[in-house]
């Protein structure tokens, strides 16, 4: 970065170009800090999924490189909202926060506000921001996050709102600065976008088509993370099971997993999300063979009715899903299975719901995220007739939640008294004498410890099951 001189012609290489603008922004920030006699602060707020959380770490990396000091206070000199648009109420939440920020900006003329992420990919949203929230300084989407420094520089040199939204891209820019939330674990993007177009989901329209990173770049990033103290990585993609299909030399996710498993010093590998339609026998075998892969699979069901699954455009039926579960359990008997289930999808009947309930009873999920269907403007499902009666949907939701919780409690209780490996993750927020960690199966454990234990693995006896978490103690002679 030090080799990028501001007197040079702006580089055309994507990475060098952004490093150039980082240096330029750095000069502007240093000058303003000198005038104000204090450091400039920045605050990033993330709405939505782990992909967004990882993007926010990149945004924060650029901001801190430029010279901003991170704070959680929205009174900061620079506030950026990385938005989600999976549900329409997520949009309303952002509009509400912007109204809150407008008062801060009136008091601080140097304050800048930026909006990015999935919500900004909707033209109606951008138009509303342009007309009703003119105090916003910078608006960009999901495809050009790597250009953040350049866009910020443009705003620093201009008095008007900067808007830069791309419909799609095939570009992936490596090696930009990043500021991780945790020192010992990290998300790693292996791909971007989604090609699945489930009828209820807006993601493919705002995240674009699938594009995979080169395996060598992923391996190099993880090796660098491990050298920096990371012991657990989460491989991220909207559908990791379709990784590598669009590469010049195609690579499967199973092959990538085996390569990541070879990295010395890495202790744990997680991944999400897995679409059942692309879950191969070879991936199941790789999970069985790779000792660092955690014993946890998040496998969204969405519905147990083959009829509803077809309308959802999920590309599998109930029998195919149950076959995958059977194969997973045969290969990895102690694997924890979690899922997502939607209740009240348009046209869902009592019979359809009972099929979902039957699958839940048959699979016995360790836990499940259950949702009442939320109409999402811009998706095929939103225009479907035969929307369900809200009272009936609520009744079904309550029945499903009760069943899920009973099964989860039974599954959790089966581990009480066992000694298992736990990654210590943080000091307990309610009791400072306890450390909170996670099992390989993603269950939470609280046990006596000190902050210096964070980021390390311990054998812990699960002394008491509390339903959704365990109390434990360091095992003797472990």
What are these regions, as identified by a protein language model?
Residues 1-243, 282, 297, 319-330, ...:
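Proteins enriched for Cys/Gly/acidic motifs involved in redox and nucleic-acid/cofactor modification
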Residues 2, 383-478:
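Terminal RNA-binding accessory module
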Residues 49, 244-265, 312-315, 373-406:
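Radical SAM enzyme [4Fe-4S]-AdoMet core and its adjacent flexible, acidic
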Residues 63, 129-130, 260, 287, ...:
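Hydrophobic C-terminal alpha-helix "anchor/cap" residues
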Residues 110-115, 124, 227-350:
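Conserved SAM/AdoMet-binding glycine-rich loop
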Residues 181-184, 194-196, 293, 303, ...:
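Short flexible coil/turn linkers enriched for glycine and charged/polar residues
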Residues 198, 218, 235, 271, ...:
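Conserved, mostly hydrophobic/aromatic
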Residues 348, 364-365:
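Contiguous mid-protein beta-loop-alpha structural module that forms a pocket-lining wall or clamp
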